[in-house]
C-alpha cells in the first residue's frame, strides 16, 4: 500500500475522525510494509517524511484548510524539517503517527509528528515548519489570518527561542 493508497485511505476516513481544532492531535495507524523497508528490514528514513506528510494532510483536511486553500488559491508549503530516530520500526510492525500543530508566528507554523510503537514508546520525532503561499498576493499568508478564516479563535503559545530559529531557517 504505497503512498497514494495510504493518502486515499486517510482522505476517505477523515470525517470519521471528526473536525480538527488547534490543540487537537491527528492519530493515524499504519503497518510497516515490504515497500517501506530498507536493507535493514526496518522503516526507510524517507518513509518517515512521507508518513509525516500524510499526518499533515489529515490535519489540513479535517481543519478545513484544503477547501479554504482551494477557494483562495493558496498552497501549503514546507519550509524545513528536523528528524530524530530513536527506535526502529521493523517490518510488519504496527505504529501510529501522532501529528499536532505546536505553535506559529507570523507566516510560519511548527508541526510535530511523533511515530509511536504499539507499546507507547516513541520511535521517531519529526518537526516541520510550513507556511501557506498566496499566489495572488505573491507572498505567505499570516497564520493568524488562516486560523481566523477557519473559524477558530485561538492564540498560539509563544515559540521558544529554538522554535523561532527553526522557523527562520
Named regions from a protein language model:
Residues 1-16, 22, 89-96, 100-169:
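HotDog/MaoC-like acyl-thioester-processing domains
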Residues 27, 78-80, 110:
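Short coil/loop residues immediately preceding or within conserved phosphate-binding loops
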Residues 69-94:
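Small beta-barrel nucleic-acid-binding modules, principally OB-folds
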Residues 23-33:
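Short amphipathic
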Residues 47-70:
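Active-site helix/loop of acyl-thioester processing domains in fatty-acid/polyketide metabolism
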Residues 36-38:
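Acidic, divalent-cation-chelating loop motifs in proteins
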Amino acid at each position: 500500500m504505497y503512498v497514494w493508497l495510504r493518502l486515499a485511505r486517510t482522505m476517505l476516513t477523515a470525517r470519521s475522525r471528526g473536525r480538527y481544532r488547534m490543540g487537537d492531535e491527528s492519530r493515524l495507524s499504519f503497518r510497516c510494509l515490504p515497500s517501506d523497508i530498507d536493507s535493514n528490514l526496518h522503516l526507510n528514513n524517507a518513509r518517515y517524511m512521507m508518513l509525516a506528510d500524510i499526518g499533515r494532510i489529515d490535519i489540513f483536511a479535517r481543519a478545513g484548510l484544503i477547501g479554504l486553500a482551494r477557494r483562495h488559491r493558496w498552497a501549503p508549503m514546507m519550509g524545513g524539517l528536523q528528524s530524530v530516530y530513536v527506535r526502529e520500526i521493523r517490518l510488519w510492525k504496527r505504529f501510529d503517527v501522532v501529528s499536532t500543530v505546536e505553535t506559529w508566528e507570523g507566516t510560519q507554523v511548527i508541526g510535530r509528528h511523533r511515530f509511536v510503537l504499539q507499546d507507547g514508546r516513541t520511535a521517531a520525532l519529526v518537526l516541520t515548519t510550513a507556511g501557506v503561499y498566496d499566489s495572488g498576493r505573491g507572498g505567505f499568508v499570516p497564520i493568524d489570518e488562516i486560523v481566523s478564516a477557519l473559524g477558530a479563535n485561538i492564540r498560539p503559545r509563544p515559540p521558544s527561542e529554538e522554535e523561532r530559529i527553526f522557523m527562520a531557517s
